[in-house]
């Protein structure tokens, strides 16, 4: 299942979301806090909030380490709200019916160049696990690095997918290869600038290509340099950032290199992308 992420550039809340003051309303909730998180779980059926808090702290530290953000890991203000739902009805009441095919939804609000709200809603899996947590927390961790602007959609989703299970990654890799074989792969000029889908048919190719491109660029240099590249691309454009970080002269040249990489990957079989092994279930 795909995740959902919402970047909001105002202080207004989307219809159906829960304010922090409302999470203590019915049903009763348990709570745990740290310098980064406030965890809410259902009192009678939910997991231990302290255990969820420990997992969140471990994941945040590992994400910061892998992506070179540890030196930027200041105390979050506001804290990231993590709301664990034990039923689909509760989850969808918070995130909206459009997220019915997801297990997690992250919400990041930006105001005056700063993050003004962080929130993740999670639907607990049947076995009691939180399979969407690592993916959604990746979005929240990355948000602080982009100078009060949303990161590019391809980068945000590609990196978050690296925190998914290998089984999910293989499905995205299959979609990427299918798009290339059928001629429906998105040109990278379109992929790099795509912020919204014009057709549901774009989605499999987008997610598959995003994972493939993120993996290629992170391997070619380092995961940390990929983040620096993305920040420069956001602030100064892709031609400048590609030349500075990868000695690539244009998006067109990147497209050629990526297609060659994807073709080679098809022949050698599935290979593990940049490892965040400790985040995988």
Predicted regions and their residues:
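Sec-dependent signal peptide recognition
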Residues: 2-10
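Hydrophobic h-region of N-terminal signal peptides that target proteins for export
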Residues: 9-18
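Histidine-centered active-site/metal-ligand motif
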Residues: 15, 135, 139, 157
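Juxtacatalytic substrate-recognition/specificity segment
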Residues: 21-152, 204, 238-241
């Amino acid at each position: 299942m795909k995740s959902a992420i919402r970047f909001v550039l105002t202080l207004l809340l989307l219809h159906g979301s829960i304010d922090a003051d409302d999470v203590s309303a019915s049903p009763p909730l348990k709570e745990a806090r740290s310098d980064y998180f406030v965890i809410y779980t259902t009192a009678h059926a939910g997991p231990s909030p302290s255990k969820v808090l420990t997992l969140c702290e471990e994941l945040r530290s590992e994400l910061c380490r892998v992506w070179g953000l540890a030196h930027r890991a200041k105390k979050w203000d506001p804290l990231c709200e993590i709301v664990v739902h034990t039923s689909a009805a509760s989850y969808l009441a918070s995130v909206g019916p459009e997220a019915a095919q997801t297990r997690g939804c992250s919400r990041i609000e930006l105001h005056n160049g700063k993050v003004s709200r962080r929130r993740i809603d999670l639907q607990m899996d049947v076995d009691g696990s939180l399979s969407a947590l690592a993916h959604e927390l990746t979005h929240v961790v990355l948000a602080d690095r982009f100078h009060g602007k949303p990161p590019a959609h391809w980068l945000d989703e590609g990196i978050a997918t690296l925190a998914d299970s290998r089984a999910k990654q293989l499905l995205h890799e299959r979609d990427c290869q299918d798009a290339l074989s059928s001629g429906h792969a998105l040109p990278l000029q379109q992929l790099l600038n795509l912020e919204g889908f014009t057709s549901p048919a774009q989605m499999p190719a987008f997610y598959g290509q995003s994972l493939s491109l993120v993996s290629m660029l992170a391997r070619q240099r380092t995961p940390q340099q990929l983040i620096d590249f993305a920040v420069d691309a956001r602030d100064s454009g892709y031609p400048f950032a590609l030349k500075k970080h990868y000695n690539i002269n244009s998006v067109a040249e990147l497209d050629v290199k990526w297609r060659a990489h994807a073709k080679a990957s098809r022949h050698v079989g599935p290979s593990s992308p940049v490892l965040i092994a400790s985040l995988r279930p």
